[in-house]
């Protein structure tokens, strides 16, 4: 059996480089040589233990783009019916459908009752902090369009599918929408991008990082607010002055910080919508007044675990917008598999917009 490298989380806050087996794909699956593995804020929560107990040891990375090395028996197309062959570039959704549960077949919702998110590091594995990913039968993957830039798609990793999932949950962005995005990391930047591409009237991005706020403007934000230079009251006043009496018709929480939640409720205007995307790994509570929700007639939706269709939509959208917006520029640094811990530390510190693991390094 042949072996390859992988960044393995062996216990909480401990990541090592291992030599792991390269498995042949199972019938219906695919073996992929990883080209880019996105480093996500969720990975930081996983390593720290905030995301809950994990079945150590696990190969990290749930954002992956790679080239097909070998197809399992019976595989001739991707999950959209597009023919595939060895060497084609693909992008995969990181949870395999079971097709045998209430969530899958009745609700058509994710996560599924029998969802498998991690596997033991020495077993066939789809983690993207590795030289190879072995995609099981049922794990949706899609062939990149010939003109697609892998970096443009990897830059938005699971953030763009998450945003598309969120807008599915709270309703699409319209031409008359006034949007506030809390946080300008990858999820927030993806929220700005989709809102701008959908024709939103006005988009305000809020963040502490001048670099991230500049990137938000390049992706379509019409105004930015520095979190470091303003109080919550000042931010609310700026939003009211910009949007008028109506206020924000849509607020997107993409900050991953608990205090963002009550502030987002305050920023949401009458009959507005508030979608929570970034608080997946933030454990705790925040006080809000239920009366505010009633008086404003507002809606709140949470969203996580995008469906396979959201990964497909994200791939198509990134390919369509890659020449209009500087998507590939979101990738601010590349790391080798051996440097995975360093990449995670820098993401935790907020020092990078979007790092990736590059297995060629």
UniProtKB/Swiss-Prot annotation:
Belongs to the zinc-containing alcohol dehydrogenase family. The lineage of its organism: Bacteria, Pseudomonadati, Pseudomonadota, Gammaproteobacteria, Pseudomonadales. This is 5-exo-hydroxycamphor dehydrogenase. SMART domains: PKS_ER. Zn(2+) 2 binds at residues 98, 101, 104. PANTHER family: ENOYL REDUCTASE (ER) DOMAIN-CONTAINING PROTEIN (PTHR43401:SF1), L-THREONINE 3-DEHYDROGENASE (PTHR43401). Its cofactor is Zn(2+). Pathway: Terpene metabolism; (R)-camphor degradation. InterPro entries: ADH-like_C, ADH-like_N, ADH_Zn_CS, GroES-like_sf, NAD(P)-bd_dom_sf, PKS_ER, Zn_alcohol_dh. CDD domains: MDR_TM0436_like. It comes from Pseudomonas putida (Arthrobacter siderocapsulatus). GO terms for molecular function: 5-exo-hydroxycamphor dehydrogenase activity; zinc ion binding. Keywords: Metal-binding, NAD, Oxidoreductase, Zinc.
